[in-house]
Amino acid sequence: MRRWLCRAVLIAAALFVADLALAPSIRAAEKVDLLLVLASDVSRSVDAEKFKLQREGYASAISDKRVLDAIAAGRNKRIAVLFLEWSGVGNQKVVIDWTPIDGAKAAQEFADKLLELPRAFADRTSISGGIEFAVAQFPRAPFAAERQTIDVSGDGTNNSGRDVTLARDEALAKGITINGLVILSDSPLPWNPEHTNPPGGLDGYYRNNVIGGAGAFVMVADNHDSFGQAIVKKMIAEIAFNPPPRGVILR
């Protein structure tokens, strides 16, 4: 009898340990319609006022009814979002980790948190570093999705780290789509005008060097004041997977 009890206890303990081991994988299999990394430029060209407008724009967009309607129209009726900030080489930080957005409450909580948290960096502009860091976030997402997208916003060209096209191509090889949100500058930087206003325009630079993958596109915000509305349009297109024709730049 005692031997039988010991065996029963051991079996129960083994099953309990197995359940604990399975729990993370079960959570990892929870399905969403999209894994979306919002990668925000906080380099030196983004001053305090521009930074404030960017954060407010993202917060407003994630909780916008039109964005929530697009989420609700998906098969799983939710997406997972991660928000990170990047600037120079080695300067990347997850500001808000993977969060499921499945309605107004979750979206508002995400938005409120985004408005509260401090700025991560203010350095040079390594778009390549931002992309590499964003790519590394997908394998640890506690959700599963058929689509993985990096949404890169920025107001200048890559001037730090390795060639941005190398980072882009590595992301595309993993099946990740990169979209761009270009923030145009009213006037070029006095000390480096081609950083914010390169030949062919910053939108052209992003189209040729940054974006790629299924349905990739560039959205343009004419300035930081119009950033909020631009990110709303961009997120709706990404969530609904309704991109513009290839090569078209949206405003």
Features from the language model and the residues they span:
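VWA/integrin I-like adhesion module and closely mimicked acidic/polar interface patches used
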Residues: T157-Y205
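C-terminal "exit" segments of structured domains
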Residues: V218-R251
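Second-shell loop/turn segments in exported
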Residues: A39-E49, V81, D97, K113-R124, ...
